[in-house]
Amino acid sequence: MSWMKINPRSMKRALSTVANSLAVFAGLLILWQLVLLIFRVPAYMLPSPWAVARSVVSRAPTLATAFTITGEEALGGLMASVVAGAAIALVFAQSRWIRRMLYPYTLLLQTVPIVAIAPLILMWVGAGTASVTLIAFIISLAPIIANTTQGLVSVEENMVHLFLMHNATPAQILFKLRLPHAIPSLFVGIRVASGIAVIGAITGELYAGSSRVGEGGLGYSILYASSQLQTDFLFALVFAATLLGFAFFFSVMFLEWWFLHRWHESARTPDAG
Amino acid sequence: MTTEFVAPAVELTGVTARYGNGANVLEEVDLTIGKGEFVSIIGPSGCGKSTLLKLISGLTLPSKGMIRVDGMTPKNARETISYIFQDATLLPWRTVHRNVALALELEGASTERRKQKTAALLELVGLREVAGAYPRELSGGMKMRASIARALATNPRLLLMDEPFAALDEMSRDRLNEEILRLRTEQKWTAVFVTHSVAEAVFLSSRIIVLAPNPGRIYQDLSVDLPQPRTADLRSAPEFDAFVSRVSHTLRASRSL
């Protein structure tokens, strides 16, 4: 397959990018260690990089479990908002009137602070992954609705005219024109939503983290580690959370590229242009 | 001898079209286009050239007057009309082949017929080699060829073209002008062609309608009595130049009305 072909020049560039990032990372570690040495910070305030690394290794199973739980919650929430968001966008695309009437509510969805409604959800759904997934879903829904609707309604007038001239049915205009046209915008929405879904899942866990004591996702474990002053583990969890965010972002980027690179300008690989 | 009544390809009677603000884009337009004619519509901007095409296609409705295409209302006649837009309006997510097949697909043609017809048309417009390419990989001229192929796929009797070559460089434009005439020798469609270019209008048409602006109306109806069939050589003939300058003159006069 053509996408698997590796261009030596871009390979070299990718390697040097990785090398640069690693150099920055090494620099930060050295700085971190220096701060510890110079200011004599106690370990419960700031553990050494070495202590964090040790914590990562010794508590790897717990970390992996927390990572997986949060990942599943965020993914569940995100997938639900893709399905629901696309469906809502389809309704919105039907008429300007519907959009005017309902759009303010999606704005509401975006502006309501999740920390304010989390206790309610906890009350209604109960603690555990279901409420956390629901929180991730609610918080990541708005960008998908907004971007997909935009994509559905921004079809050029002449394209619609072309379809009309060939006696296209409304269903044909929707499925052969508006939907494919909206896919790049849908992906923009998913990209934004994926980051928010991870944040939503972690925040959700702070409130509705676990139905069982001692076992939960990253948010729950962060809360737990901080209450126990296990700062090294706390750091390990923060890294895991960052990694999760990255994993989501790059997975969406890859999917976007996979679906669009053949025809869409924005999804071209940098070395193709 | 029996005389059979043949409906003209296009007939407009007392057609007035209004903007949203109430001003007339076109006022009291009477126009009859016979079958097999190649009519160019030319005129200063704002004279309602594109509106005229939209009216004939039924995409816009007149506020007054009557429009008939082949004796039918524009909407009922749609199966016999194809429209070529200024931008090629290719679907970027479809390959050239699937773009050309689109019109047939929408009209419910069988897969077999679609394949056959599309392949033949791609051959005809010289795009066989790039059938599997996506529009973004094509030059402007190639995109327009694909757009033409798509329009011809449904065997139209009337082809409406809204400045289809305006965005192309002069060489591609000249080549496509010749192609359009060549394609017409195989399928004898009637053409209504909107353009800004006097030379293009003269080269292609059997008749040129010059519109005047504010409100848009027919200013002059010129028949182009240059020899048929037209070939590239015509462009360097003195009578071609003479006709072009005559039309340019009329066009200038229409603007200063």
Regions found by a protein language model. Give the residues of each.
Chain B
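A short, flexible loop at the N-terminus of ABC-type nucleotide-binding domains that lies
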Residues: E4-A9, A17-E28, K35
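The feature captures the beta-strand-to-loop junction immediately N-terminal to the Walker
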Residues: I42-P44
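Helix-to-loop junction immediately C-terminal to a conserved catalytic motif
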Residues: S57
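Conserved ABC transporter NBD signature motif
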Residues: G65-A77
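Conserved ABC ATPase "signature" region
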Residues: A101, E105, E112-E129, R182
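Conserved signature/switch motifs of ABC ATPase nucleotide-binding domains
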Residues: A133-R136, R150, T154
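Catalytic Walker B motif of ABC-type/P-loop ATPase nucleotide-binding domains
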Residues: L159-D162
